[in-house]
Amino acid sequence: MKKRLIIYFNYHPNGQADAACRFAVQQMAAVGQVFFVNNGPLQPESRQWAQGCCHTVLERENTGFDVGAYRDAVLQIGLDMLLQYDEVVLMNYTLAGPVGDVAAMFAVMDGRPELDFWGLTRHYAMRSHRFGGAKAMVPEHIQSHFVVVRSRMMADFFAYWQAAALPASYEDSVRLHETQFTAHFAALGYRWDTFVDTKDLASLFVNPIMACPKLLLADRGCPFFKRRSFFTPYADELRRTDGQAAAELYDYLKSETDYPVDDLLRALLPVQPLAAMAQNLHWHYILPQTAGECAPILLDANTLAKGCALQPDAVYCLLLPRAAGVEGYYYARSMPTSLQLAQAAELFDAHSLVGVLGPALPLYAGCAAEKARRWQQQKPAVQAKLSALDCPLPLDETPPPLPNGGCLLVRGAAFPQGLPPLQTESDFWLVPLLAQYNGYASATFEAAAQCAARADVLDAALAAQRGVGPVFRLMGRTVKNALRKRKESAR
């Protein structure tokens, strides 16, 4: 086996080496020595773990993103030591896996001795003002989440990092390092390629590992996928794909591999926006047509106002304050029957990751607008209450999937500290967020009839969007031409 050094960069807002990071490092340790570099201080338990399984552990100031981490690691190791390795791997925590035996990938690439450096996947060329610099053009490149450098280019590799400047933003990191690394060394005459062959997808997707991760894992032998698949902003995802990539990836990992994907999701939940994860993973279920033999335990307003402990193996029903107006009318109509509540409670048995369930948002368009307005009004109070409970969570502009009116069903195990006093509207927003902090998801449910109607509502919304699109494009061209004429007249 080749002598390899794996420089693994990790960052976690709470200073942890989480479950997915540990799994990746332990698997990679079978194919090389691991130099673990962390942006920011590690928590004591995570530091002890890293020191126990890695060759070297470096904790550095949280500056410069991945560029700063790689640079400090390379410079600390030094050129003389780097030259003792056949390959140096740059890898970071944004990848999850491996799925399967990672040694098989290295064995395949060992059969490509003509390459001077190689990567896992590539990003294809695209126009981008955000990442493309002055020319607004991103070249085709190896993605920086996994790059392997061989010994014959090690001197130039070391010089590259000696000269590397620390980026001040994520955009700078991509623009000045990730999109330039491949071209820089190719211009010096070094040959490169990627392990995963996606040439046939280049005309469809600029970023295949995000657009079709399940395809790359199942059919292309790719041993890794992006954590971000599960929390990327869903509106962005819909501009690129049909929005099903993350759910397909999860189902594949859960049913056809041994990868502990639920451990990854439990690690992501406390540090990523709940709404984005719920949308990407489609945490929405149709009520099972069962007898509903396990009715949830009803918690009345007096009990909720005082706060209460919960039995971990029990399911509880929390009635929400009644809303006013036409929205309140539709919320009241969406309140499940006793049978539907019992059927919904059975969903907890089928989905161990779910800690909170509630009725889906009514189809009346005003309910969605009213929920978004209420969330913006209540978010500061919710954030303050989370801080008082010592539960720091990222709150997004998009509201959490619940509450939607009517009631909430909660799994007792999702609230080991019990429920805090719940009286005001901002209090009830805490329920899905506290479950999230404890590593549990929130999901919505509805009857099959409402789900069928939802498809028609979606069709109507998409038709309206298509009608508006040409108008906005015309407005855009008009503004662009006006700005061009103003610029020309100023010369």
Locations of regions flagged by a protein language model:
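ER/Golgi luminal nucleotide-sugar-dependent glycosyltransferases, focusing on the catalytic module
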Residues: 1-491
